[in-house]
Amino acid sequence: MIPALDIDSLEHRLVAGDRAALARAITLVESRRADHQVAARTLLSRLMPLTGRAQRIGITGVPGAGKSTTIERFGCNLVEAGHRVAVLAVDPSSGRHGGSILGDKTRMEQLSVQANAFIRPSPSGGALGGVARKTREAMLLCEAAGFDVVIIETVGVGQSETVVADMVDIFLALLIPGGGDELQGIKKGLIELADLLVINKADADPAKAERSARDYRNALHILTPAHPDWTPPVLTASGLTGQGLDVLWTQILRHREVMTANGARAARRADQDARWMWAMVRDRLEDAFKTAPAVAALVPDLETAVREGEVPASAAADRLLAAFGL
């Protein structure tokens, strides 16, 4: 167990805005050690009253949409305007190849050196649920440290868009200018998740970008909006030149104003918290199950038998559950 005095010191330094303390606290919540997890829960419980005041922004994008460039320029603009900006990532594949955000941190040289900015690579290893848990806790720590804008990036792998959308106030999709073929290629689910669409790289061909924006606006008309008071705007912008990023921030603030006034923002966060509670229950139960000695002793042989078709998955599951006492 980490001594209580260390947790006290870490808490005080983090609340004072110490980025090194914030990084250490995030490392603590990412740890799989049982004593570290207990300490992390203690720290988070103490800090909860200081969370919830930040604008939580999720950003995803199609390949080549210029997410890193846009996030850096957008973040720098917000810092210059007096905000404190944290950038986190959800990358369930980071345990295999290091995660794109590691490269992003290197490329975000201007933002990373800002005193009022904090960039954190995706936690490595584990399934998407575990990565999401660590990222959500990192978001709360950033808020407690005084960051009033938290940007969570998804690399767009599998269900990561849904996971990120379920921990933020507004979810942005970065797209690239294109014609009908490109429009058809965009996943409908991504468009339905987005609260705001941005046609990026508009500086290269403004007319083409505007045509794409018009196409997406038309496409949105056939979809039922997630909330009757909000139709997702479709903007054009350039992360390279900064064009349109001021309008983007204005729309984010408008979304917050509308959703706060009608109660949807509070309801969205309440629903997220309830789902988060059950996700934590599942996560803790799975950890307890997999680390139980009786279960761990059976897993290698049963996994091999299932893979080779010798034992049905349902029968193997029954044996594991019985070993756990269920």
From Swiss-Prot:
Top-level EC class: hydrolase
Cited InterPro entries: AAA+_ATPase, GTPase_ArgK, P-loop_NTPase
Gene Ontology CC terms, in alphabetical order: cytoplasm
Positions annotated to bind GTP: G61, V62, P63, G64, A65, G66, K67, S68, T69, D203, S238, G239, L240
EC numbers, comma separated: 3.6.-.-
Family matches, as Gene3D superfamilies: 1.10.287.130, 1.20.5.170, P-loop containing nucleotide triphosphate hydrolases
Claim: Nucleotide-binding is one of the keywords in the record: yes
Alphabetically ordered keywords of this record: ATP-binding, Chaperone, GTP-binding, Hydrolase, Nucleotide-binding
Domain of life: Bacteria
Molecular function in Gene Ontology: ATP binding; ATP hydrolysis activity; GTP binding; GTPase activity
General function of this protein: May have GTPase activity. May also bind and hydrolyze ATP. May function as chaperone.
Family label: Belongs to the SIMIBI class G3E GTPase family. ArgK/MeaB subfamily.
NCBIfam families associated with the record: lao (TIGR00750), PRK09435.1 (NF006958)
Protein name: Putative GTPase CC_2483
Organism: Caulobacter vibrioides (strain ATCC 19089 / CIP 103742 / CB 15) (Caulobacter crescentus)
